[in-house]
């Protein structure tokens, strides 16, 4: 059941949420609150329920138990995994932007006002002049920016992203991280999923550690620690501090600990 919350700073509140596929619980008894202006990441191993929980927040699946309460009139902008997109689909950047118009018939004529609004969002995200380009012709970082631009087209209250750095190179990952940080600095609330502990999660203000249930919830310094990570991944994990940030190594990488110039946490 989804209800509306009254507190103006609370955007989403998950209350004892359980989601199942058949008889198998994928997410179990999850509780967390996301407030306006927060930047939070849901982290965990493959199959931990990250995407399922995100879909429940988006309203595309219903919890079998518990409730998800949302601010009345909450607008969400969703960015899917880029890996899930068929790049052979013959569309331009502008046409991708127009796919948000779900209330209209398929492939309607693009009005002058809609084109101008789309161009404005693209310009703000560093994509000015690319609206007529085929989406496949763009770099990985540009493609991800296009989907973020599409999510921002209708001025959402919160940006929701599923694995925004999955399958991208280091340069694109940095571009995405800086883009999201800039949007957050401008006042956007952000909720994302990621399995990228060092490249993305360690840079976020808040991490919700999920393995079917919430294992920990806090800052990277609070949750990227060996005892929490072992509960989360079911295997020993080693953590270093390097440049003032936690660096997570799995058990197989422990022999390399002394070569990083950092100290164990």
Walk through the language-model features, giving the residues of each.
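Conserved ABC ATPase "signature" region
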Residues: 98, 112-130
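Catalytic Walker B motif of ABC-type/P-loop ATPase nucleotide-binding domains
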Residues: 159-162
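Helix N-cap at the start of a conserved alpha-helix in ABC-type nucleotide-binding domains
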Residues: 170-172
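ABC ATPase nucleotide-binding domains
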Residues: 225-226, 232-265
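Helix-to-loop junction immediately C-terminal to a conserved catalytic motif
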Residues: 58
């Amino acid at each position: 059941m989804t209800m509306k919350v009254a507190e103006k700073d609370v955007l989403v509140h998950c209350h004892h949420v359980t989601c199942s596929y058949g008889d198998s619980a994928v997410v179990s008894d999850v509780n967390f609150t996301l407030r306006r202006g927060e930047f939070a990441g849901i982290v965990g191993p493959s199959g931990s329920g990250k995407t399922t929980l995100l879909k429940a927040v988006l309203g595309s699946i219903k919890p079998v138990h518990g409730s998800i309460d949302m601010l009345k009139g909450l607008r969400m902008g969703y960015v899917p995994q880029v890996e899930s997109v068929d790049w052979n689909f013959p569309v331009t950047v502008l046409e991708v932007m127009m796919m948000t118009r779900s209330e209209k018939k398929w492939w309607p004529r693009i009005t002058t006002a809609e084109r101008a609004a789309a161009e404005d969002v693209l310009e703000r995200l560093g994509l000015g002049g690319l609206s007529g380009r085929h989406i496949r012709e763009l770099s990985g970082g540009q493609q991800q920016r296009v989907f973020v631009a599409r999510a921002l087209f209708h001025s959402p209250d919160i940006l929701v992203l599923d694995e925004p750095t999955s399958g991208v190179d280091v340069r694109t990952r940095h571009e995405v991280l800086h883009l999201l940080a800039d949007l957050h600095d401008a006042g956007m609330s952000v909720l994302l999923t990621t399995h990228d502990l060092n490249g993305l999660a360690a840079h976020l203000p808040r991490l919700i550690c999920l393995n079917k249930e919430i294992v920990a919830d806090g800052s990277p310094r609070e949750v990227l620690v060996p005892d929490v990570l072992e509960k989360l991944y079911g295997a020993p994990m080693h953590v270093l501090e390097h440049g003032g940030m936690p660096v997570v190594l799995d058990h197989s990488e422990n022999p390399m600990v002394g070569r990083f110039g950092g100290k164990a946490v």
